[in-house]
Regions:
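Short, highly selective alpha-helical patches that border small-molecule cofactor pockets
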Residues: 109, 113-117, 182
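Conserved TIR/SEFIR loop-to-helix hotspot centered on a Trp-containing motif
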Residues: 40, 174-191
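Conserved BB-loop
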Residues: 121-159, 174-179
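Switch/connector loops and helix/strand junctions flanking conserved nucleotide-binding motifs
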Residues: 145-147, 178-181, 205-212
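Arginine/glycine-rich "motif VI" loop of SF2 helicases in the C-terminal RecA-like domain
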Residues: 125-129, 187-198, 202
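Inter-motif core of Ras-like GTPase G domains
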Residues: 167-170
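C-terminal interaction surface of TIR/SEFIR-family domains
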Residues: 2-35, 64-88, 92-95, 114, ...
C-alpha cells in the first residue's frame, strides 16, 4: 500500500515519543500527574490524526497500550508499553522517513567516510551542535564517535534498536570485508532489519559483496556522479530537506569526487 502519511505526521509522532520519554524520566516524582494527563491527551490526538482506529494491524497494538494509559493508575511499565507501540507504528507507517544515518565502514577507510560526512552535511543532514546529537553516527570520526568505554557493537545495536528510524550507509571495500568489526555491524543491521544503502568504494565491485545482507539491493559506486545525484534526491525526501541550488550541488559533488580520487584506498 502506498505511504499516504506526511513528514509533519512523522514529526508529530516523534514529539509524542519524546513526551513519553520525559514522562518516563520523572515517573518516580509524585507530582508528575499533569505529564501523564498530557501524554494521554496527546496520544489520543495522534490516534485520530493517523486514523489508527481503522488501521490494521496497528489497531490492536495501539489500543492495548492506549487503554492502559490511565492518568490515575498509570504505571511506569504502562508508559514503556506505549513507547514500544508508538515505535512499532513509526517503523511500520513511516518506513520511508528517517531520523538518523549510520555509516558502517572500516576504520582504514576513515578518509573516505570523512569526505562522505562533509557531503551529507552539505545536503542538509544536521551536524552535532551545542551538546545536541546530530543526525549521523559512526565509529571513527571525531564528533560522531561511540562514547568512551562503550562496547562498539553493543552501542551500535542499541542505536539501531532505539525509537529512531535509522538509514545505514555501508561503505563496502576490501578493508570492510576483511574486518570482523565491520561484519558485526553488518550483522546488527541485518538482525534489526534496518534499511541500508550499499555504497561501493573505488577498490571494490558489486560482485564481491557477500555476507549477511541482501546483495541484490541496489547500491552505487561512491564516485558515480549520476548515482550521487539520485542519492541526494532520495535523502532530501527521506529527511524532508530543502532542495539545493543545483549549481552549488554540482560543485560540492564534483569536489567530493575529486577528493576521493586523491585518496589512495589501497594504502589507507
Amino acid at each position: 500500500m502506498q505511504n499516504t502519511y506526511t513528514f509533519e505526521q512523522f514529526q508529530k509522532l516523534n514529539e509524542v515519543l519524546s513526551m513519553a520519554k520525559e514522562c518516563l524520566k520523572d515517573f518516580d516524582n509524585q507530582n508528575n500527574f499533569e505529564s501523564r494527563c498530557q501524554l494521554r491527551r496527546t496520544v489520543g490526538s495522534l490516534i485520530e490524526d493517523l486514523n489508527l482506529r481503522n488501521s490494521s494491524p496497528h489497531k490492536r497494538r495501539i489500543y492495548y497500550n492506549w487503554d492502559i494509559l490511565n492518568e490515575y493508575s498509570c504505571k511506569k511499565q504502562d508508559v514503556l508499553f506505549v513507547i514500544e507501540a508508538l515505535t512499532g507504528i513509526k517503523k511500520d507507517l513511516f518506513a520511508t522517513f528517517y531520523d538518523k544515518i549510520f555509516i558502517s565502514h572500516s576504520e582504514k577507510d576513515y578518509a573516505i567516510a570523512k569526505e562522505l560526512i562533509s557531503l551529507l552535511h552539505g545536503i542538509g543532514i544536521k551536524k552535532p551542535v551545542n551538546g545536541l546529537d546530530g543526525q549521523i553516527f559512526c565509529s571513527s570520526y571525531d564528533g560522531y564517535l561511540i562514547p568512551l568505554r562503550e562496547n562498539n557493537t553493543e552501542y551500535i545495536k542499541a542505536q539501531l534498536d532505539s525509537t529512531d528510524n535509522v538509514l545505514s550507509l555501508i561503505l563496502y571495500s576490501k578493508n570492510y570485508m576483511n574486518s570482523a568489526a565491520c561484519l558485526n555491524e553488518a550483522g546488527a543491521i541485518w538482525i534489526k532489519d534496518i534499511s541500508f544503502y550499499p555504497i561501493i568504494l573505488p577498490d571494490f565491485s558489486f560482485e564481491e559483496i557477500k555476507g549477511f545482507l541482501n546483495p541484490n539491493i541496489t547500491g552505487f559506486k561512491i564516485n558515480d556522479k549520476y548515482k550521487l545525484n539520485e542519492f541526494k534526491d532520495n535523502l532530501i525526501k527521506y529527511f524532508n530537506l530543502q532542495e539545493l541550488n543545483y549549481n552549488i550541488w554540482e560543485q560540492d559533488r564534483d569536489t567530493f569526487i575529486s577528493r576521493l580520487n586523491n585518496i589512495n584506498v589501497a594504502n589507507l
